[in-house]
Amino acid sequence: MKLTKTEQVLVFELSRYSVEKYTVTKFCQKLDINRGAFYRRNSNICDLFTSVLTLQTRRALRSVGNESMDRMFYRMLKKIKENKTFYGNLHRIAKDPPLFYRVLRKEYALAIENYMRPRGPFSVRKVELVANGIYAIIFNWVVDECRHDIRDVYQSIHLLLTHIEQTIRRAE
């Protein structure tokens, strides 16, 4: 999947090494735009981070063929592990982590709902609870610099996803 120019610059700048501070001015210089153009699209740097995270999460959780929900999330975990410096920097630099929570939790819930919708009835409340749990697991893994084995993190997410899939089995 092709990255947008904004994503390319941000991923390149934040993937090389650990960064404590990243400014709008530095981003605009690398993208070769003025700050006014940046602020027409984003309210601050955290807004930019959130939009890039949203795009990357949507791409990673897009169902491919007859792929299971477990495979979608495992694919996303692999992508996070491959770019752990980038994701770690985003969380470290962000001035508004609760915004990440609201947006990413919603994206996880939306991916689960899109997977479940053609398969039968499901509880929206249960989907939201599972999405909260998945966010907490992934957030803690990223904050810990992806030190835990990806299979352990995947197993934790799999245990949550089984609660959703049980709803389908009961309906059948």
Predicted region positions:
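Terminal, non-globular segments
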Residues: 7, 108, 143, 164-167, ...
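Short, hydrophobic secondary-structure boundary micro-motifs
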Residues: 23, 88-90, 150
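Hydrophobic recognition helices of helix-based DNA-binding modules
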Residues: 52, 56, 60, 111-115, ...
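Secondary-structure edge/capping motif, primarily at the C-terminal ends of alpha-helices
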Residues: 64, 87-90, 115, 141-145, ...
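Amphipathic alpha-helical packing segments from all-alpha helical-bundle domains
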Residues: 94-132, 136
